[in-house]
Curated annotation (Swiss-Prot):
A motif (DDXXD motif) lies at residues 326-330. The Asp-Asp-Xaa-Xaa-Asp/Glu (DDXXD/E) motif is important for the catalytic activity, presumably through binding to Mg(2+). CDD domains: Terpene_cyclase_plant_C1. Its cofactor is Mg(2+). This is Valerianol synthase TPS1A. Mg(2+) 3 binds at residues 452, 456, 460. Keywords: Lyase, Magnesium, Metal-binding. It comes from the Eukaryota. Expressed in flowers. It comes from Camellia hiemalis. The gene is TPS1A.
């Protein structure tokens, strides 16, 4: 998110020239304005879920199962989206499995890669040396690997857990993509397996929205001849019940946003209440985090309008006034602002007051101060970009990234996300950890910033925009746009490696917190994969409908 708008008053009191972005309008009209939760259906789902949960819990802790079977059960639970019900039991099982793991010669590629991915996802640093037996004396993959589609698919997914210095996993990633792409639609794959491969190549497990990926996997799993009907039934019920909760929450948010009526006062801004809630649901979908989803959505909406104000409407002089007002964080500062900014500033103060009151009821309002300070920091960095645009200044890539890691919103989103977690998880120490500018938060911000720079570059430059990371890199290195894009994607991949490494034990803070930073990073991979899906919401419209409207047939 970067500033592109400056303007000068012409002929005294005339309206300044503004480089309006003409963002696409909201897609949703009044679609989410009303929703009545079917309490009878909710209770019906809930009663059966409780019975099935106990049956599945018994499966997880039951002895006598081989390690490969146990790791596969854990994988299925995670991919079906129901593992959050059994976190304690799963962690206990994984601790035992990792301690006893041996690179058994009988394990095939599918099983080894599955162990690797599951262990790494849970912070256990399994060495990629476990894959050596699938390579020949020249270091190339054995011919048998190319004939093992399930094994290659499992290895492909495992490569997304790589850290720096693991060149083999880079090679394996390129190899499996090439092999799997060559097989899609061919005679050697069943239609069901081909569908799985195509989806995996489009969206990896590790970088996908957990709830969306669960829904996809449920559709694959119910076609699996070896499926467990109890697991499948639990997954369907759980998805549909949680969807009802999310839909009700979205209705409350949507009505709140309509009643706030901010967009009518700042019509230049993107109207994205539904998309912000979608974003928040990726950060945490679990039922106990309803307050967190509401808090994060509201703050994201305010930041979105603030970004558009700096990016596509405000003059430089107006933006300086607004920056100063945000630093003061006092209602009296409103008097100095233009009318349209008064509406935004009033909303900012009121929403944070509302959030603070709601969290104070639960004794966890101490994070609000940190969120406010992060918001102030972003606004200061927005003004820096506004000044760069005004002066026609192209920063060095290093100077750009120093400021961009602030405007990428990593600190604000992480802080605001933590505010919605339980007090015994998001402690005061957790918020202080964010202030240390940890590598994981920086990496998450870098991913979001660089992906957005690439995907929105042409459109932003067409209307007039501060030099992005792509422009700064091209000028400093004297390379073409395409060459710069290649280098920026290398940086994005390294940032993902850093995230993966920061989640390996021992971790700096609780894994329950780190998973939220990971989830915030996943948003960039889904929403900005091919184009800026936040600015152009039709790109992610099907995702929104799938998550919040379309239940799974029972």
């Amino acid at each position: 998110m970067a500033s592109s708008q400056v303007g000068d008053m012409v002929n005294g009191n005339a309206e300044p020239t503004r480089h309006l972005a003409k963002f696409p309008p909201s897609l949703w009209g009044d679609r989410f304005t009303s929703f009545t939760l079917d309490k009878q259906l909710w209770d019906k789902y809930g009663n059966e879920i409780e019975v099935l949960k106990e049956q599945v819990r018994s499966m997880v802790v039951a002895g006598g199962r081989k390690a490969a079977e146990q790791i596969n059960l854990i994988n299925v639970l995670e991919r079906l989206g129901v593992s959050y019900h059994f976190e304690k039991e799963i962690e206990e099982q994984l601790e035992q499995l990792f301690a006893k793991f041996e690179d058994n010669e009988d394990y095939d590629l599918f099983t080894i890669a599955l162990h690797f991915r599951i262990f790494r996802q849970h912070g256990y640093k399994m060495s990629c040396d476990v894959f050596n037996k699938f390579r020949d004396s020249n270091g190339e993959f054995k011919e048998t690997v190319s004939n093992d589609v399930q094994g290659m698919l499992s290895l492909y997914e495992a490569t997304y857990l790589k850290i720096r210095g693991e060149g083999f996993l880079d090679e394996a990633h390129a190899f499996t993509i090439a092999q799997l792409e060559s097989l899609v639609g061919g005679p050697h794959l069943s239609s069901d397996l081909s569908e799985q491969v195509m989806h995996a190549l489009k969206q990896s497990i590790h970088r996908g929205f957990p709830r969306l990926e669960a829904k996809h996997f449920i559709s694959f799993y119910e076609k699996d001849a070896s499926r467990n009907e109890t697991l499948l039934r639990l997954a369907k019920l759980d998805f549909n019940q949680l969807q009802l909760s999310h839909r009700e929450e979205l209705c409350h948010i949507f009505r709140w946003w309509k009643e706030l009526d901010l967009i009518s006062k700042v019509p230049y801004a993107r109207d994205r209440a539904v998309e912000c809630f979608f974003w928040s649901t990726c950060a945490y979908y679990e039922p106990q985090h309803s307050v967190g989803r509401a808090v994060l959505t509201k703050i994201m909406l305010l930041l979105s309008v603030t970004d558009d104000t700096y990016d596509a409407y405000g003059t430089y002089d107006e933006l300086k006034l607004y920056t100063n007002a945000v630093q003061r964080w006092d209602v009296s500062a409103m008097d100095e602002l233009p009318d349209y900014m008064k509406a935004l500033y009033r909303a900012l103060l009121n929403v944070y007051d509302e959030v603070e009151r709601d969290l104070a009821k639960q004794g966890r309002d101490y994070g609000v101060h940190h969120s406010k300070e992060a918001f102030k920091e972003i606004v200061r960095s927005y003004e820096i970009e506004a000044e760069w645009f005004k002066e026609g200044y192209v920063a060095s890539f290093e100077e750009y990234m120093k400021n961009a890691l602030v405007t990428s919103t990593g600190r604000l989103h992480t802080t605001s996300c933590f505010m919605g977690l339980e007090a015994d998880v998001a402690t005061t120490e957790a918020f202080e950890w964010i202030l240390t500018k940890p590598k994981m938060v920086a990496a998450s911000g870098a991913i979001g910033r660089l992906v957005d720079d690439v995907m929105s570059h042409d459109e932003e430059q067409e209307r007039g925009h501060v030099a992005t990371g792509l422009d700064c890199y091209m000028k400093q290195r004297g390379v073409s746009k395409q060459e710069a894009i290649v280098e920026l994607y290398k940086m994005i991949e390294n940032a993902w490696r850093d995230i993966n490494e920061e989640m390996l034990k021992p971790t700096a803070i609780s894994m329950k917190l780190l998973i939220r930073v990971l989830n915030l990073s996943r948003i960039s991979d889904v929403v900005y994969k091919y184009v800026d899906g936040y600015t152009h919401p039709e790109i992610i419209k099907d995702h929104v409908i799938s998550l919040f409207e379309d239940p799974i047939p029972m």
